[in-house]
């Protein structure tokens, strides 16, 4: 009984082994790797750009940072006015 079960299993395993790697598992040759390089670099650049924009938007929306930016703007404006009135 064991022999009857193991023979079909052995045949299937041998067929899979002799078939070779699946197309997804095959290693790409060097020329195809260089052909895809510009696409991959562009995709990487776009991803990096999106992440940078999201980080900048996140920083802009933080309340403490908005208050700090407003305070610096107001202080700089007051300093500018004071210097203008002092030297005019």
Swiss-Prot record:
Q: What is this protein called?
A: Apolipoprotein C-I
| One GO CC term, this protein | endoplasmic reticulum
Q: Which GO terms describe its biological process?
A: cholesterol efflux; cholesterol metabolic process; chylomicron remnant clearance; lipoprotein metabolic process; negative regulation of cholesterol transport; negative regulation of fatty acid biosynthetic process; negative regulation of phosphatidylcholine catabolic process; negative regulation of receptor-mediated endocytosis
Signal sequence, start to end: 1-26
According to its UniProt entry, what is the function of this protein? Inhibitor of lipoprotein binding to the low density lipoprotein (LDL) receptor, LDL receptor-related protein, and very low density lipoprotein (VLDL) receptor. Associates with high density lipoproteins (HDL) and the triacylglycerol-rich lipoproteins in the plasma and makes up about 10% of the protein of the VLDL and 2% of that of HDL. Appears to interfere directly with fatty acid uptake and is also the major plasma inhibitor of cholesteryl ester transfer protein (CETP).
**Record's keyword annotation contains rRNA-binding:** no
**What GO molecular function annotation could you give as one example from this UniProt entry?**
fatty acid binding
Per UniProt, which keywords does this protein have?
A: Lipid transport, Secreted, Signal, Transport, VLDL
Q: Which family does it belong to?
A: Belongs to the apolipoprotein C1 family.
The cellular location(s) given in this protein's UniProt record come to:
Secreted
Asked whether the keyword Signal is assigned, the reply is: yes
What are the TM regions of this chain, as residue ranges? Answer: none
